[in-house]
């Protein structure tokens, strides 16, 4: 556990794991059997982690969703899909590497995969624009969606972005049109679409690849119209109220499932997806398999009717007499 990055609220877990690592080093360097103490502390660490993650606050979930070791789109592609062949460029201007996509196989069935991609180090983060997609990324995604529709290939999207790139260059290249067109086109694509929020689901930047037939969120991911920090800056004129904003935004998977805004929650390993990315991928794959089975038998007309009904269900309200 030496290379694990612990969040602020995981301090007690980090201290326990540090003791375990120290005992293991001592055991290796001496003939003393410390296995009993190591096992005791390991069980205590696992229990503490489980208890802590069972009662995370919305703000703590935001921190987990942003964890630097959390699996990204290409990690899930490597674990879940085979024969992935990445496709580049929007055929109009450029190739935005904050969105990746291409052809792959899911259980030997051809499909199209599209998702946001962040970086692990400074160089990668700059190359991926820190996970903020530009208009070219959304146009590249739409090109792949249209390719999938042409050959009736199922589409899997993976959402993990703080939001669309807010730079002047993005506005000059018509960011709002790119997002709006994706929303419109995805609503009428005649092929199954399964969307999964794997980390941050930030506003229109997430929605632009988030319209589908089945919406999934990982247990400790978030989905919101605005980041807690930005919300705090607007409402309280101070970014230091991010925790209160997170509580008010209703951005967690369980809250959004209760509101009917997503369909399924994919549970994460104890301690979050970053603790065991491969196990997380196996758990998610089962949810994706079940989700695809539920929609792949529908013909194009049935698929569109069902999708339209889902979209029209969003935002319903009821008037009550005062």
UniProtKB/Swiss-Prot annotation:
The keyword rRNA processing does not apply. Disruption phenotype: Becomes sensitive to thailandamide antibiotic. The keyword ATP-binding applies. Pathway: Lipid metabolism; malonyl-CoA biosynthesis; malonyl-CoA from acetyl-CoA: step 1/1. One of its GO terms (biological process) is malonyl-CoA biosynthetic process. One of its GO terms (molecular function) is acetyl-CoA carboxylase activity. It is found in: Cytoplasm. Coiled coil: none annotated. InterPro entries: Acetyl_CoA_COase_a_su, ClpP/crotonase-like_dom_sf, COA_CT_C. It catalyses: N(6)-carboxybiotinyl-L-lysyl-[protein] + acetyl-CoA = N(6)-biotinyl-L-lysyl-[protein] + malonyl-CoA. Residues 37-294 form the CoA carboxyltransferase C-terminal domain. Gene3D superfamilies: 2-enoyl-CoA Hydratase, Chain A, domain 1. Keywords: Antibiotic resistance, ATP-binding, Cytoplasm, Fatty acid biosynthesis, Fatty acid metabolism, Ligase, Lipid biosynthesis, Lipid metabolism, Nucleotide-binding, Transferase. SUPFAM superfamilies: ClpP/crotonase. GO terms for cellular component: acetyl-CoA carboxylase complex. Component of the acetyl coenzyme A carboxylase (ACC) complex. First, biotin carboxylase catalyzes the carboxylation of biotin on its carrier protein (BCCP) and then the CO(2) group is transferred by the carboxyltransferase to acetyl-CoA to form malonyl-CoA. Confers resistance to the endogenous polyketide antibiotic thailandamide. Can replace the endogenous gene in S.typhimurium, conferring slow growth and resistance to thailandamide. Can also replace the endogenous gene in E.coli, conferring resistance to thailandamide. Thailandamide is a polyketide that is toxic to human cell lines but also has antibacterial activity on E.coli, S.typhimurium and S.aureus. It probably acts on acetyl-CoA carboxylase in the fatty acid synthesis pathway, which is rarely found to be an antibiotic target. These data suggest it might be a good starting point for engineering of novel antibiotics. HAMAP family: AcetylCoA_CT_alpha (MF_00823). This is Acetyl-coenzyme A carboxylase carboxyl transferase subunit alpha 2.
């Amino acid at each position: 556990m030496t290379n694990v990055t612990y969040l602020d609220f995981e301090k007690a877990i980090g201290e326990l794991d540090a003791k375990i690592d120290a005992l293991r080093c001592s055991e290796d360097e001496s003939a003393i059997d410390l296995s009993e103490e190591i096992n005791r502390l390991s069980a205590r660490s696992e229990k503490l982690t489980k208890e802590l993650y069972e009662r995370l606050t919305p703000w703590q979930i935001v921190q987990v969703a942003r964890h630097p070791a959390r699996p990204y789109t290409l990690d899930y592609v490597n674990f879940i899909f085979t024969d992935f062949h990445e496709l580049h460029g929007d055929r109009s201007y450029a190739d935005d590497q904050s969105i990746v996509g291409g052809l792959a196989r899911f259980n030997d069935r051809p499909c199209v995969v599209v998702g946001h991609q962040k970086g692990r180090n400074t160089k990668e983060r700059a190359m991926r624009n820190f996970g903020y997609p530009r208009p070219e990324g959304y146009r590249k995604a739409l090109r792949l969606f249209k390719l999938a529709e042409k050959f009736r290939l199922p589409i899997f999207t993976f959402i993990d972005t703080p939001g669309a790139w807010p730079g002047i260059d993005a506005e000059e290249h018509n960011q709002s049109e790119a997002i709006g067109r994706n929303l419109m086109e995805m609503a009428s694509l005649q092929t199954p679409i399964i969307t999964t929020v794997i980390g941050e689901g930030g506003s229109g930047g997430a929605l632009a690849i988030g319209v589908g037939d089945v919406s999934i969120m990982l247990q400790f991911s978030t989905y919101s119209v605005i980041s807690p920090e930005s919300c705090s800056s607007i409402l309280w004129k101070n970014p230091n109220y991010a925790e209160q904003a997170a509580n008010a935004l209703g951005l967690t998977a369980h809250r959004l499932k209760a509101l009917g805004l997503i369909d399924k929650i994919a549970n994460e390993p104890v301690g979050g997806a970053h603790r065991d990315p491969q196990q997380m991928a196996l758990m998610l794959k089962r949810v994706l398999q079940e989700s695809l089975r539920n929609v792949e038998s529908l013909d194009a007309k049935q698929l569109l009717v069902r999708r339209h009904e889902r979209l029209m269900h969003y935002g319903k309200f009821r008037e009550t007499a005062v």
